[in-house]
């Protein structure tokens, strides 16, 4: 009985151990089933998390609800078959299937005689004297040996024809050698709109357009614009802003500068919207010149007209000076009109005989050349026309130059450092002379010189000028070859146009023969010096 009882105890212990081991095994199985991969063909990439089925790590659910592998770098010439795992198409290799496979370098060689690698494939051709068979092998052919083809030949219905190993090659004029076909030029290439065709021998490939680079974006390779402005690879001026565009960039000069963007030069801080107007004596002198021009125009109109003997009554109201046959009148005075009528009746017969000669001696004035003679006294009182050259009793306008037709009688000095430039106003209304900001050297000198043909004891020189810039330089006026200027101006607070009036007094021992404008360039590269409306007359300047 004791033995029997001991045996029963050992059996119980053994049974207990078996139960514990089974429980542990079932626990391990249950823990493994918490994340179990489902290997069904229809559920590739699906893992079970407990009772829930989701895509495994490295897989994602597509629009159809199926789990598909994710390749972060993409598969250019292949397909993604697993997490970051590509299966390349024939003819390509590499982790991302973006490299051409050189089949001709494989062992064993795919061709019996000669192999030519192409993009994504290869071509076989035979040596001279052999024929390419349908299975890719080369067969000896006496006819092909006689054909002397560059890349072998084939026999079609008893006719021998030389072959080219690629569709991008064609038989040359001799019928034996192969020449390249430029698919890009003949339009056989097929490239996306944002890529350009690059021809190769026997083929071609598509490359991103200039200004684009190939990048992997949103699961595929595409040509993306290069931001030249961000990479600082543009060619814009330091005084211009770079604006990136698709495939290119644009340069736009900053505020205060002008140019094409690659070269920008400074402009005026205060653009001139209209031509400056003279005031005072300058305005009066110009009115006198215009009155004389009107007189000459009237003389020219009646030059070939036979004068009649009847008397034309003058108008009662004259608002500005006009030239008539016996002189210049200014309206507003009835007594002067009556006196003019009496003088006209008395002197009409004498003037008719000499009128033609007087008219021929008069010349039309131009605003950009020397004025011959302007009667200042004629504007103030009426005088009859004489048979001789008119003798001015007062001032003469020697120069009235606005630089609209060039530099008039002013000449560039050949011994200075730079020339004055002929510049157009911003509003397109006229021209002026300027010293450009980009001169070849600092403190350079540029001169404009005028030779005087008539000598007077006094001159009145009037002009407008502009000096813009912190250290733009100096503008001077010289008489003859004197070393000391009679007038000098530097930059002032008002950088707009200003009027200058200089009275030149001659001595009994010296007479002026030339007047010179001299510009001395300063250190400011963005400043400018300008000159316009130069007016020179004999006599003193008025105090108006």
UniProtKB/Swiss-Prot annotation:
Region entry Disordered, spans: 332-357
Domain of life: Eukaryota
SMART domains in alphabetical order: EGF (SM00181), EGF_CA (SM00179), MAM (SM00137)
Compartment annotation: Secreted, Extracellular space, Extracellular matrix, Basement membrane
Broad class of the protein's primary localization: secreted
One GO term (biological process): cell adhesion
InterPro entries, sorted: ConA-like_dom_sf (IPR013320), EGF-like_Ca-bd_dom (IPR001881), EGF-like_dom (IPR000742), EGF-type_Asp/Asn_hydroxyl_site (IPR000152), EGF_Ca-bd_CS (IPR018097), Growth_fac_rcpt_cys_sf (IPR009030), MAM_dom (IPR000998), Nephronectin_domain (IPR052235)
Family matches, as Pfam families: EGF_CA, MAM
Residue ranges annotated for the MAM domain, each copy included: 399-543
S-S bonds: 67-80, 71-86, 88-97, 104-115, 111-124, 126-138, 184-197, 191-206, 229-242, 236-251, 253-264
Coiled-coil ranges per UniProt: 333-367
Family: Belongs to the nephronectin family.
PANTHER family from the UniProt entry: EPIDERMAL GROWTH FACTOR-LIKE PROTEIN 6, PA14 DOMAIN-CONTAINING PROTEIN
Entry protein name: Epidermal growth factor-like protein 6
Organism this protein belongs to: Xenopus laevis (African clawed frog)
GN (gene name): egfl6
